[in-house]
Each structure stands twice: as C-alpha cells, then as structure tokens.
Amino acid sequence: MGLTSKLEKLKLKELTGHEAAVKSNVVNGADTDDTDDIDEMDNEGQSILMGIIAQLRPGMDLSRITLPTFILEKKSMLERITNFFQIPDMLLKANRTSDDVERFVSVLAWYLASWHIAPKAVKKPLNPVLGETFNCYWENISDDCSAYYISEQVSHHPPKSSYFYLVPEAKIKVDGILIPKSRFLGNSSAAMMEGWAHLTLGEHENEVYEMNQPNVYCRGILFGKMKMELGDHMYVKCRKTGLEADIDFKTKGFISGTYDAIEGVIKNSKTSEVLYQITGKWNEVMEIKDLKTGKKRVLVDTKSSVPVKPRVRPLEEQGQYESRKLWKPTIDALARRDHTVATEEKFAVEDEQRNLAKKRIDDGVEFHPKFFRPVNEKEVELQDLEYVIYKKFDLKSNPEVLTDEVLSIAPILPGQKHDEKFEIPAFKKHEET
C-alpha cells in the first residue's frame, strides 16, 4: 500500500470505545477534556504509522511527510514556544538577584523549569504555515509585571519560527528563533531543535544570556510503547560574566540507564573553573552541588511551580493567519477526536498554502515577514538569530514607553484596534526607523 493510500485510510479510522470513554470523561487515566493527554496510538494507529514509516530511509527528512492527526497536539509550534515563558516568577527572581553567579544559576533554573510543560501523551505541535502569527500576553504575573509575546513563521522550507518576549516593568526581553529539523532514525524520530534565544536583562547593563535547546526524540514508533525523550546538550552562556552551563539530557540506553535524566556543569570560561554540578530529572527534581563546599540543594522542583498560561485576543478579533483562528477547525476536530474531519481540515489549510506559494511564484512576488526582519551582516552578535523584531527596544526606557512600543508592532490585547502598519513588511518598517 502506497503512502497516499495509507493516509487515505486515516480518513476511515474511528477510535473504538470513544463514546464510552467520553461518558466517563477518562481514557487511560487522563481527562478527555484535554485530548493532548490521551495516548491514541492503538494497534490500528500504529499499523498505519508503521506503513508510512516503512517507506522511509534512516536519516530522511520528515518535514514533508504528512503524519496522522492522532499524534498532533492542539496548538501550533508558535504557541508551543510560549511554554518557555510560563514560569515567570523564576525569571523575575533571577532579575532581582544582584550577585552575578547566583543570577546565572537562577536564569538556568528558570530555563530548566519549563521543559516538563508538555502533553502527557506523545504529541507533535502543528507545523505553522508561512506568515502565520501567534501573539499573546500575561497580566500581573508577579511583581506587578505584565508580559507580551509576538511570533511569526518567517520561513516554511526549512521551517523557522521567530519570537519576541518582553516584560516592560522588569526591563526583560527575549529574542529567539526555532528551527526544528525532523529525522527518521528507525524505531525513533528526532526533532533536532536548532536555533538560539537571547535573554537580555536591562536592569543589569543589558546582560545577555544565549541559550539553545535539547533535541526531542520519539521512541517506539514502529514497535513498543511510544515515549518522548529529550536528548543531547543544552547550553546557556553569558559573555559578560564568562559563565557557561552545559547540560546533557541523557537518553535511556537499550539495556541500561534511566529516562529523563540530566547531568551538567556550570563553569567560568574565563578561568576554566567548574563551579557547580547539576543532576536530576528534567521533569521531576533537579539539584545543584557547589563544588567548593560540597553542599547540594534543590535547583528546580517541577511540581512546585504552576504554569501560567498566556492569554489571547477573542477569536473574532483575530486575523486569518493567527494560529488559533487558522487552525480552529482542525483543533476542534482533534478535541472531539474526530480524525476524519481533523485530517480534512488540516489538508485544507495546507492545500491553500500550496496554492498561495504557486501564486507568489507565478506573480514573481517574494514573501516578507511583517514583524521580524533579517539580521544584517554588521549585527555580528545577532547572527545566530537570523531574524529579529523590526523595532529596536531601548530597555532604559520607562515601562509605559516599552509597552506602547510592543503594542505598536502587532495586535496583542483584547479590543486593540487593527493598524494598517501591522501588515507592512518588517524590513520596510525597519528602514523607516
């Protein structure tokens, strides 16, 4: 059976026992109100997935392969990125810390604290379409602060998601880009999470922390139980202080080892002195050991922090290519576990994108993002970001000015009036400033 036939069969797939499960509101111990927590990989589903993957070669790029909808999360990757910002109290604590080393440790703790925020089942976020945007905000997160987030899919092949985060009252901003590259590895698939984020603390002389991400592995896609693992090295470094963290996300060996373990160190790159050792599990408790004193303490307890979810404008105020509006029919079908409709709705979005891409080629029109501009060759320290928000932010400005500036870029708050400037390509708006 060919790849197309396998995908067509998905339209006929209906989950057995679904009605009974909905009545009890529980499937495999998870609340059906959140279908992202439900493992829907039954025997037929695994057979379909195996039929698709059996036609692939190890190392093959999966970005152009249409995967069955029962492994999809009910959100776009642009929204999934906001998981990093859902433990804001830890970031604000780091910002309040005056000691350079302790501040670095606190920044690392904040960054490690968010990796456990994910569906209980193995789910993959929806691939954003070119020009898709997701904007959101947080009110009164801590210390009387608010936060704003703007994101845009700046490239589709390869997929590149640019994002910007700002806490005006605390003079904190984050510029980042995520470039996931999927690979087939036999009984596993891998999402190589390329891209970097730059966290800037304006209250500490614009101190910048550069950080990347661990890679994501999905095990057991051909046989065995599907399991998501984080693997490989994650780095956090601050050039101003010379402090660096190297965190190794351990993957379980075939015979020995354990799931979800991390090991790492914090060192001073200027002196090569190793200051701390990090151990634990990224989805449970992580500890830090001072190598001078031998004292060990909890760095992060993931159960002690409750994620603060972002807020978005009402659906009726959103534009056609804002994530939640664009994917609403697909997401609604996924929530009902109606994979026939979910597949059809997802295909409709993707088919429209193919038509738009063809029209751009026919018309000789090049796509340009409207919120993010390309980094130019003179911006040496920003090269790994590739794209940045088009407006320059002076973190010395007062919070009111910073808030006005971020709201002038994109519609974020409920009731915010649409401005025609929002639609102008970012590089043109940057040239005018």
UniProtKB/Swiss-Prot annotation:
**Signal among keywords:** no
| InterPro entries listed in its UniProt record | OSBP_sf, Oxysterol-bd, Oxysterol-bd_CS
Task: Give the highest taxon in the source lineage.
Answer: Eukaryota
Swiss-Prot/TrEMBL GO biological process terms: endocytosis; exocytosis; lipid transport; maintenance of cell polarity; piecemeal microautophagy of the nucleus; single-species biofilm formation on inanimate substrate
Q: Does the keyword Phosphoprotein apply?
A: no
GO CC terms: cortical endoplasmic reticulum; cytosol; membrane
Keyword line: Lipid transport, Lipid-binding, Transport
- Cite the GO molecular-function annotations of the record: sterol binding
Q: Beyond the main fields, what else does the record say? A: The C.albicans mating-type-like (MTL) locus contains, in addition to the genes for the regulatory proteins (MTLA1, MTLA2, MTLALPHA1 and MTLALPHA2), a and alpha idiomorphs of a phosphatidylinositol kinase (PIKA and PIKALPHA), a poly(A) polymerase (PAPA and PAPALPHA) and an oxysterol binding protein-like protein (OBPA and OBPALPHA).
The record's PANTHER family line, in alphabetical order, gives:
OXYSTEROL-BINDING PROTEIN, OXYSTEROL-BINDING PROTEIN-RELATED
The family classification in the record reads: Belongs to the OSBP family.
Report the protein name in the record.
Answer: Oxysterol-binding protein-like protein OBPa
